[in-house]
A protein has these predicted regions:
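Alpha/beta-hydrolase active-site loop
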Residues: 294-314, 333
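Catalytic His-Asp segment of secreted/periplasmic serine-dependent ester chemistry enzymes
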Residues: 36, 139-214
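Active-site segments of SGNH/GDSL-like serine hydrolases
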Residues: 96-100, 123-156
Length: 464
């Protein structure tokens, strides 16, 4: 009996060691690899297989021209590939459907898009393998013909509906649209990626598969706050009052190890593409409204309390600080007092010297001034605190619109950069030639996201 038991245990260990993670990719022509010289080896599922190696099995069930809609002109529901995908015993399912639904012939049925998507998801969720399901936003269409795949329909209808589905189904969603929006050269026919585009898609999906998760961490249950949950671009957002200030915490679908987080200093939800991208990587996004205290001691005190509450709830000890415009005042004044609690900063067309703040009444109130001109002598601006800031040894990223009419770069970002470098600090400035104060950020936030991932230790290199 002992011999039989030993054999069974050994067999079990061999099977476990040889276990292969099955990844099923469903979609239309982009998944299939249409227009590529050799779809069998160059489609993004094929390239994903090469990146992941022999411990994974990636299957391509893409069907050219297929729609998510049941009533579409070529519905994925009616294809043999769909049935094969259901029978593939998947551990992970990537769903890349929605572009063809933006054709004129299919738009009449878009009212049924969410229902059809929910049903498709359930058909996989109910499989015995209970796969992880990841939804991909459609990439852009650069076609001008509104009868065909039309990008305005993708942006204004398909993507919001898809995010609603992701929120209601508690599923991950990956923003492929932003990743391609500034890379028309990757799409020679305006709708299908070339080899470079499919390679970047494969790498993005590779990152999702291999990044370590903390599946059990839930910051909402650990904050000890009464909150109202809302939908932040497909992610759960807790809104609550803390120290009589309006606060928000958005949690990712899964937390990265170490529970990293981004602290938005001001203008919640404005140009959110960086925040959304980092949520995809397992970061949390938080906000504590201290407008309009302009980074004074009262504001710093509120933020100190907020930081303590969040870190006690399990978020990492160092925050990524993000500030647009006068948000730069808030983030750097807090960083000057708390340099060892900062992982890195991202400041965008940032106001860094309160001498150039236009509202004298607020300035006098916040800093107890007789007249606004006294602000310079108080040395209460980030431009005056560079020595304290660089003590944190954290990297800083600034976006600077060269033609900014609201915040003069020469008196703010560029002077700040000079002072940081003189004191041995680490700062990178991305210039935006010809741009004014708005818009902030970048349509494709990849340079910002890559900077933050590298600074926090979450960047995933290409495998050897």
């Amino acid at each position: 009996m002992k011999k039989i038991l030993s054999i069974l245990i050994a067999f079990s260990l061999i099977n476990t060691a040889n276990a292969v993670t099955r990844i099923t990719c469903i979609g239309a022509s982009i998944t299939y690899g249409a227009t590529l010289p050799d779809p069998a080896t160059q489609s993004y599922p094929a390239q994903l297989q090469k990146l992941l190696g022999e411990k994974y099995s990636v299957s391509n069930f893409g069907v050219s021209s297929a729609t998510l809609l049941r009533k579409g002109d070529l519905s994925y529901w009616n294809t043999k590939a769909y049935q094969q995908a259901l029978q593939s015993k998947p551990d992970v399912v990537f769903v890349d459907l929605g572009g063809n639904d933006a054709k004129l012939i299919n738009r009449v049925h878009l009212g049924e898009y969410e229902k059809d998507y929910h049903d498709l998801i359930q058909s996989f969720a109910q499989l015995p393998s209970h796969p992880r399901i990841v939804l991909l936003l459609p990439i852009p269409s650069f076609q001008a013909d509104t009868n065909h795949i039309y990008d305005k329909t993708i942006v204004n209808s398909i993507i919001p509906k898809l995010r609603n589905v992701a929120y209601n189904e508690h599923l991950e969603v990956i923003d492929m649209h932003s990743m391609f929006v500034n890379h028309e050269s990757w799409m020679p026919d305006k709708i299908h990626p070339n080899l470079e585009g499919t390679a970047m898609t494969a790498k993005r999906l590779y990152d999702i598969i291999v990044q370590p998760h903390d599946k059990t961490f839930d910051v909402f249950s650990r904050m000890n706050q009464q909150f109202k949950e809302t939908d932040f671009y497909g992610y759960p957002c807790a809104g609550f009052t803390f120290d009589n200030r309006d606060c928000k915490v958005v949690k990712p679908k899964w937390a990265a190890k170490g529970h990293p987080w981004v602290w938005r200093a001001r203008f919640w939800g404005h140009e959110p593409q960086t925040d959304i991208a980092l949520l995809e990587h397992g970061f949390h996004i938080v906000y504590c409204d201290v407008a309009e205290l302009l980074g004074n001691n009262e504001a710093i005190g509120y933020w100190d309390d907020f930081y303590k509450m969040l870190t006690n709830a399990g978020l990492g000890k160092k925050a990524v600080l993000e500030g647009m415009s006068r948000g730069g005042i808030y983030l750097y004044n807090w960083a000057a007092v708390n340099p060892n609690k900062v992982a890195c900063t991202y400041a965008d067309n940032a106001l860094l010297d309160l001498k150039y703040w236009p509202d004298s009444a607020i300035l006098k109130k916040d800093f107890n001034l007789t007249y606004a001109g006294q602000i310079g002598s108080l040395k209460v601006s980030p431009i005056d605190k560079v020595g304290q800031i660089v003590k944190g040894n954290f990297p800083m990223l600034h976006l600077s619109a060269d033609d900014d009419e609201a915040v003069d770069p020469s008196k703010n970002t560029l002077l700040f950069e000079q002072k940081v470098k003189e004191l041995g600090g680490s700062i990178t400035v991305i210039h935006k030639p010809g741009f004014k104060h708005h818009p902030h950020s970048l349509p494709n936030p990849a340079p910002i996201v890559e900077f933050i991932l590298k600074a926090t230790g979450y960047a995933i290199p290409f495998p050897n």
